[in-house]
Curated annotation (Swiss-Prot):
Binding site for shikimate: T19, L20, S21, T66, N91, D106, Y220
GO MF annotation list: NADP binding; shikimate 3-dehydrogenase (NADP+) activity
EC class name: oxidoreductase
Catalysed reactions, semicolon-separated: shikimate + NADP(+) = 3-dehydroshikimate + NADPH + H(+)
GO biological process: one example: chorismate biosynthetic process
EC number: 1.1.1.25
Residues that, per the record, bind NADP(+): D82, G130, A131, G132, G133, A134, I218, G239
HAMAP family tied to this protein: Shikimate_DH_AroE
Pathway given in the UniProt record: Metabolic intermediate biosynthesis; chorismate biosynthesis; chorismate from D-erythrose 4-phosphate and phosphoenolpyruvate: step 4/7
This protein's name: Shikimate dehydrogenase (NADP(+))
Keywords assigned by UniProt, alphabetized: Amino-acid biosynthesis, Aromatic amino acid biosynthesis, NADP, Oxidoreductase
Family according to the record: Belongs to the shikimate dehydrogenase family.
Originating species: Thermodesulfovibrio yellowstonii (strain ATCC 51303 / DSM 11347 / YP87)
Length: 275
């Protein structure tokens, strides 16, 4: 039951209608008897500053930040965690009496989503598609775990910026897309939002994917490229695992309580079965 004391948590993004975050967080709040409510807000790029100001004005406890705001939101935040300083992208904000602090739980969310599937990162070659906020967190996580990173992005300057930012943490190289690249790759990661919309192009030509590849996608409604990878015979890791684990870390930041992982997992499985 929502009362005058209920703490509000939100998520800012565009598009946002597909998000499962309100469902899993509200189920977790209910299970633990916490007086919180999680709500989705469709925030356009030109309204982001006003939306962040509203966190303070409305005394919202915290929010998740998703595409396309993970990088641009930084300029409106008071304090940044060490990981955000290293990555340059925020996916979680905590409001502590009007002081907004940005965190990035995508890093550990991605690492644990692969570990859950028995996939080690150490000494593996990763092809990262994209060079936005999510890609930064994923690249940082892979390098932290001892993997090697190859980045393909349609705008080379963005990929170069990531290389310069993260080369001190490990091996990172920018590539053009052809078979000679994918032949040495162990894991392909789509770190773009391509696949969310019906008319989106595929981020990679499926002909370059082989059965021995692991294919990962940060998007959690199944994308056309995920279906192609499954058809080819790849092990496929969707965005659900990353969603679960980044949510668990964010949950603790807001509530100071350990997230009920199994309840959140069951909720996600029910939602996926329903779909």
């Amino acid at each position: 039951m929502i009362t005058g004391k209920t703490k509000i948590i939100g998520i800012f993004g565009d598009p946002i209608e597909h998000t499962l975050s309100p469902l899993i967080h509200n189920e977790a709040f209910s299970y633990l008897g916490l007086d919180y409510c999680y709500v989705a807000f469709n925030v356009k790029k030109d309204k982001l500053k006003e939306a962040v100001e509203a966190i303070r004005a409305l005394n919202i406890r915290g929010v998740n930040i998703t595409v396309p705001h993970k990088e641009t939101v930084i300029q409106y935040i008071d304090e940044l965690s060490d990981e955000v300083k290293n990555i340059g992208a925020v996916n979680t904000i905590l409001n502590n009496e009007g002081i907004l602090k940005g965190f990035n739980t995508d890093v550990n969310g991605f690492i644990l989503s692969l570990k859950d599937e028995g996939i080690s990162m150490k000494n593996k070659n990763f092809l990262i598609l994209g060079a936005g906020g999510a890609a930064k967190a994923i690249v940082y996580g892979i390098l932290k775990e001892g993997g090697k990173v190859y980045i393909y992005n349609r705008t080379p300057s963005n990929a170069l910026a990531i290389k310069e930012k993260f080369k001190k943490f490990g091996f990172i190289e920018i590539v053009e897309m052809d078979k000679s690249v994918t032949e040495k790759i162990d894991v392909i990661v789509n770190a773009t939002s391509l696949g969310l919309k019906k008319d989106d192009p595929m981020p990679l030509n499926p002909e370059l994917i082989k059965p021995e590849h692991v294919y990962c996608d940060i998007v959690y409604p199944e994308t056309p490229l995920m279906r192609e990878a499954e058809r080819i015979g790849c092990k496929v890791v969707g965005g659900i695992g990353m969603l679960l684990w980044q949510a668990a870390f964010a949950f603790k930041i807001w509530t100071e309580v350990e997230a009920p992982i199994e309840i959140m997992k069951k909720t996600l499985n029910k939602l996926l079965t329903k779909d």
